[in-house]
């Protein structure tokens, strides 16, 4: 029984304290689902007009205007992080107990006790000191640049667009996945039907890889078990 517990307990601790890889939900924000879609105004044009509502009118804005229209997002994200922490603690304790601690009130007793103290004048002193100094620093610079075509999923009642798009590439056995969603204003879309990612509200950008490189960078399960139960 003891041998069984010896082998099972580490895995039990690992199951309680195992870490999960960070995840991101591409689900639309709550307000996007709650807001009613904008009602489209179907205005009929006069027959023979140059501004008709055909599939390719002569005079029209090339920017996305309706549901299922495409918008190209230029992703230019960069993050810079620098943190530093210092901690120092110190504690010192001193205790003294002198010899000759016996005393008396009357003269005879006091005289006798003085003689005893002279022979038993034993005292002690203790000193303890604890010091701790810790320093930590971290710096990180990351950048991610790419473009992705998204689709207008919903036009909100205030005229803003909820967009969503994804792209998957398979190169030499490595699969790259890019997903993006968020809310944009139609006024921020350029004349070439592109928009910078900095103008996307509630932006969610996911980039991950699947393949040999991704598997080689993951920690083996044995290392995770040791880290989970290692107390120091």
UniProtKB/Swiss-Prot annotation:
GO terms for molecular function: cytoskeletal motor activity. It is a lipid-anchor. One of its GO terms (cellular component) is cell outer membrane. InterPro entries: Flag_Lring. It is found in: Cell outer membrane; Bacterial flagellum basal body. Residues 1-15 form the signal peptide. Pfam families: FlgH (PF02107). GO terms for biological process: bacterial-type flagellum-dependent cell motility. HAMAP family: FlgH (MF_00415). This is Flagellar L-ring protein. It comes from Campylobacter jejuni subsp. doylei (strain ATCC BAA-1458 / RM4099 / 269.97).
